[in-house]
Amino acid sequence: MAAAVVGVSLRRGVPARFLRAGLRPVRGLEAVHGICRGAQTAAAATSRIKKFSIYRWDPDKPGDKPRMQTYEVDLNKCGPMVLDALIKIKNELDSTLTFRRSCREGICGSCAMNIAGGNTLACTKKIDPDLSKTTKIYPLPHMYVVKDLVPDLSNFYAQYKSIEPYLKKKDESKQGKEQYLQSIEDRQKLDGLYECILCACCSTSCPSYWWNGDKYLGPAVLMQAYRWMIDSRDDYTEERLAQLQDPFSLYRCHTIMNCTRTCPKGLNPGKAIAEIKKMMATYKEKAAAA
């Protein structure tokens, strides 16, 4: 009865008027369905082969030299991100391929690498659908390589540790007894700074850091230094500035701005460094007048 009201038979979607008239169902509909199914099957069967040229080097192999190795991946059977392709290659094509990865959602920074000429996160970088182009993947530039796509971040983390990235209070009598509260306005000053995930994409895209990586702290670390300098709960702003007075730690920045262009979180390390330089000028004036 319900089918009659709607005017459509529940059997194969045939209009009810044909059934009431005693007419046979139109077989053309079945033919159309068959054609559609065939087209879908043919489309699925057509492979979309994408080539990935990946940096390889294994220090545990005597005489092994850095080289590029090409892998082919069917994009119809792969997720949309470069990290999906790397995982597929490791799981199905070459288990020796080595890279870092963890969260797969742009939060941890583990999968930072150089993809198609730019530093970014493999988990948030979409695969270029142009099958005629080979996607080239390298470890982060100008860093020692542990193996394949794994850079040695020891110096980077040592520099981060050197800025003492935590709250420092001159009066610690209330430590552990109550919260150090902030106003909404003071808290908002930290926006665009605290979101840094320390992936090192910005620092390793900076020519100044390539040239003076042992002395220049680099954009990532300097942005974090600024984050603690302007935190209203911190009492060591002047001491933090004094730590950066030498010619290299801060002043090797020449506002090339590669750092801001490449940041996968959309942050602006170059602006943070400029703000530190402004604070440094005021600090030096105070020190000279004292």
Swiss-Prot record:
UniProt domain 2Fe-2S ferredoxin-type: residue ranges:
50-143
Q: Does the keyword section mention Transport? A: yes
Residues given in the record as [4Fe-4S] cluster binding sites: C196, C199, C202, C263
Task: Briefly describe activity regulation.
Answer: Enol-oxaloacetate inhibits the succinate dehydrogenase activity.
Cofactor note text = Binds 1 [2Fe-2S] cluster. Binds 1 [3Fe-4S] cluster.
Q: What class of enzyme is it?
A: oxidoreductase
Pathway membership of this protein?
Carbohydrate metabolism; tricarboxylic acid cycle; fumarate from succinate (eukaryal route): step 1/1
Span of chain positions assigned to the transit peptide in the UniProt entry: 1-38
Q: Where does [3Fe-4S] cluster bind?
A: C206, C253, C259
Sequence positions that bind [2Fe-2S] cluster = C103, C108, C111, C123
The record's listing under InterPro entries reads: 2Fe-2S_ferredoxin-like_sf, 2Fe-2S_ferredoxin-type, 2Fe2S_fd_BS, 4Fe4S_Fe-S-bd, 4Fe4S_Fe_S_CS, Beta-grasp_dom_sf, Helical_ferredxn, SDH/FRD_Iron-Sulfur
Indicate how the chain sits in the lipid bilayer.
Peripheral membrane protein
* Subcellular location as annotated: Mitochondrion inner membrane
One Gene Ontology cellular component term attached to this UniProt record is: respiratory chain complex II (succinate dehydrogenase)
Matching entries from PROSITE patterns are given as: 2FE2S_FER_1, 2FE2S_FER_2, 4FE4S_FER_1, 4FE4S_FER_2
Principal location: mitochondrion
Q: Identify the cofactor(s).
A: [2Fe-2S] cluster; [3Fe-4S] cluster; [4Fe-4S] cluster
The GO terms describing molecular function are: 2 iron, 2 sulfur cluster binding; 3 iron, 4 sulfur cluster binding; 4 iron, 4 sulfur cluster binding; electron transfer activity; metal ion binding; succinate dehydrogenase (quinone) activity; ubiquinone binding
EC number annotated for this UniProt entry: 1.3.5.1, 1.1.5.-
Catalytic activity line of the entry: a quinone + succinate = fumarate + a quinol; (R)-malate + a quinone = enol-oxaloacetate + a quinol; (S)-malate + a quinone = enol-oxaloacetate + a quinol
PANTHER family, per database record: SUCCINATE DEHYDROGENASE [UBIQUINONE] IRON-SULFUR SUBUNIT, MITOCHONDRIAL, SUCCINATE DEHYDROGENASE IRON-SULFUR PROTEIN
Q: Its biological function?
A: Iron-sulfur protein (IP) subunit of the succinate dehydrogenase complex (mitochondrial respiratory chain complex II), responsible for transferring electrons from succinate to ubiquinone (coenzyme Q). SDH also oxidizes malate to the non-canonical enol form of oxaloacetate, enol-oxaloacetate. Enol-oxaloacetate, which is a potent inhibitor of the succinate dehydrogenase activity, is further isomerized into keto-oxaloacetate.
Family label: Belongs to the succinate dehydrogenase/fumarate reductase iron-sulfur protein family.
Q: Which NCBIfam families match?
A: dhsB, PRK05950.1
Task: Tell me the protein's name.
Answer: Succinate dehydrogenase [ubiquinone] iron-sulfur subunit, mitochondrial
The organism of origin for this protein: Gallus gallus (Chicken)
Q: Mind giving the lineage of the organism this protein is from?
A: Eukaryota, Metazoa, Chordata, Craniata, Vertebrata
